[in-house]
Amino acid sequence: MTEAFARAKINLTLHVTGQRPDGYHLLDSLVVFADVGDRVRTEPAEALSLAITGPQAVNLPVSDDNLVLRAARAMGGQGARITLEKHLPVASGIGGGSADAAATLKALAELWQRPLPEAAAVLRLGADVPVCLEGRAVRMAGVGEILEPLAGPLPPAWLVLANPGVSVPTPPVFKALARRDNPPMPERLPDWGSADELAAFLAAMRNDLEAPAIALAPEVAETRAALAAEPGCLIARMSGSGATCFGLFAEERPARAAAEALRAAHPGWWIEPARMAG
């Protein structure tokens, strides 16, 4: 048996800088990961199969179009019994499906003793799959295929992730964008010596999908505001195309206290504190 952890992908920034003739949008994004996520387990079998367990399994029915099965077929489609233990909300802007696909590629590469697919095949699985396969903090550009390592390590920090229980499909959010030629981040990203310095940088940056997502799902604005109001929250913003938002904290204790308070105030929300991983 092999196992891989599918960590949540967090877009600390997400600038939409253009659109290609084929319709794909060009992005400039600072991507980090959180130490919370799904787990993929694989075992030898004659046929390819997928079982989904975990607290979020009810929201993700098994189908041939599931990214886990698509990733398995991209690896060559041998037999394997795959179990996806689902903890991340579905269609929530934190790369759950893409992280699951990347974890499947890693687990099956070990099980079958095969190399990972070429970069183009990985990108065809989804724009976030390459960065999830990378699994570390990067600057992501192009349509997701350009991954630039950061100049230095990220400062120690914690994230509180909050999802109000609504799914925000990505295509309508992009369709509702007012502009598709927004300015990118600075050419050279600074080195951040502390979580406060990182938060100050983020405050001058954007998630261009936040406004259209809020127009489609006003709960996103409520979630962001609830995070921002918690003591110790340095900045709150939506990740990806939503609806999950993150709050950035310098230390573990206020992050866990914020998560506990938010769970009490919003029992229907999905809320997780997690260390920010570089």
Curated annotation (Swiss-Prot):
Pfam families for this protein: GHMP_kinases_C (PF08544), GHMP_kinases_N (PF00288)
Binding residues annotated for ATP, in chain numbering: 89-99
Top EC class, one word: transferase
BP GO terms, sorted: isopentenyl diphosphate biosynthetic process, methylerythritol 4-phosphate pathway; terpenoid biosynthetic process
Protein EC: 2.7.1.148
Catalytic activity, as annotated: 4-CDP-2-C-methyl-D-erythritol + ATP = 4-CDP-2-C-methyl-D-erythritol 2-phosphate + ADP + H(+)
GO MF annotation: an example: 4-(cytidine 5'-diphospho)-2-C-methyl-D-erythritol kinase activity
Gene3D superfamilies: 3.30.230.10, GHMP kinase, C-terminal domain (3.30.70.890)
Catalytic residues identified in the record: 9, 128
Record pathway: Isoprenoid biosynthesis; isopentenyl diphosphate biosynthesis via DXP pathway; isopentenyl diphosphate from 1-deoxy-D-xylulose 5-phosphate: step 3/6
InterPro entries xrefs: GHMP_kinase_C_dom (IPR013750), GHMP_kinase_C_sf (IPR036554), GHMP_kinase_N_dom (IPR006204), IspE (IPR004424), Ribosomal_Su5_D2-typ_SF (IPR020568), Ribsml_uS5_D2-typ_fold_subgr (IPR014721)
UniProt keyword list: ATP-binding, Isoprene biosynthesis, Kinase, Nucleotide-binding, Transferase
Sequence similarity: Belongs to the GHMP kinase family. IspE subfamily.
Function: Catalyzes the phosphorylation of the position 2 hydroxy group of 4-diphosphocytidyl-2C-methyl-D-erythritol.
Protein name: 4-diphosphocytidyl-2-C-methyl-D-erythritol kinase
Organism: Cereibacter sphaeroides (strain ATCC 17025 / ATH 2.4.3)
Name of the gene encoding the protein in the UniProt record: ispE
